[in-house]
Amino acid sequence: MSVLDQNAVDINPRISEAEVGDYIALLKPRVMSLVIFTALVGMAMAPGHFHPVLAITSLLCIAVGAGASGALNMALEGDIDAKMSRTANRPIPRGRITRPEAMTFGMTLAFFSVMTLGILVNWIAGALLAFTIFFYVVIYTMWLKRWTAQNIVIGGAAGALPPVVAWAAVTGTVDVEPLLLFAIIFFWTPPHFWALALFRSDDYARAGIPMLPNVAGPDATRLQILLYTIVLIAVAAAPWALGYFDAVYGVVSLILGAGMLVLAINVYMRRERSQSLRATRKLFAFSILYLFALFATLLAEVVFRALAPMAGGA
């Protein structure tokens, strides 16, 4: 049965008794926080002056677009979420919100976020935001996630696009710098989510999602995590190696990368189940810290550059 057929079967004409908190949960606030932060870094890196009102508008539109993607994802995956312990308490499996309501909510937010960004800022950014939402909802959620173990690899492009959208909001173009940010997030995604998939493999198997551990096995997944981590370290150092950022960022990226590598090697070496679960959980948790710290360093250097001339003039 296809995703659309499943949705048709599950449509319930009743009106739910949802509270505001249930609709907020549809937006996936934790994912939104990462989207906003990476978009902020992309915006701060962009050259030229950007009016604060337009900057706030752009970030809000990107955030709302991400929230719309989350709501549409939950609407389409209500059947999956109900089978997984990690997602069973989401509003749709609990019966707080119906799938048609979530779909309407998500589509409304998607429309207004794209149109607002396009009309008030520029249509390059608006088009990129529309493509990001489309890629996450249609390409990843409706197709890749249910049909291929490479779902995270290809689908990770959607999560990597917010800095590119933010850069385009400022400049109306796309350049090398935001593509480097895109590449960092893109290559960070597989180690992050495959670590989750390793210690949640039973959950994914129960839901019928072909995550790599359930298709290729845990050992192959551990090797892929290690290989992608090595690539990630090199990609993360690229903004410094190519001369876009100073040595401070380069050192921080290598230190953080060393931490990721040690944990990835630990995951690769630990084959006994209890030790493997601990190792994968540590890598998953550290990977979140890794990305925030890496982008925080980028942002700090951009801010320092902006303040340095004023300090010198004083």
Swiss-Prot record:
HAMAP family tied to this protein: CyoE_CtaB
Disulfide bonds: none
Name this polypeptide is given: Protoheme IX farnesyltransferase
Family membership noted in the UniProt record: Belongs to the UbiA prenyltransferase family. Protoheme IX farnesyltransferase subfamily.
Enzyme Commission (EC) number: 2.5.1.141
Statement: the UniProt record of this protein carries the keyword Membrane: yes
GO molecular function, one term: protoheme IX farnesyltransferase activity
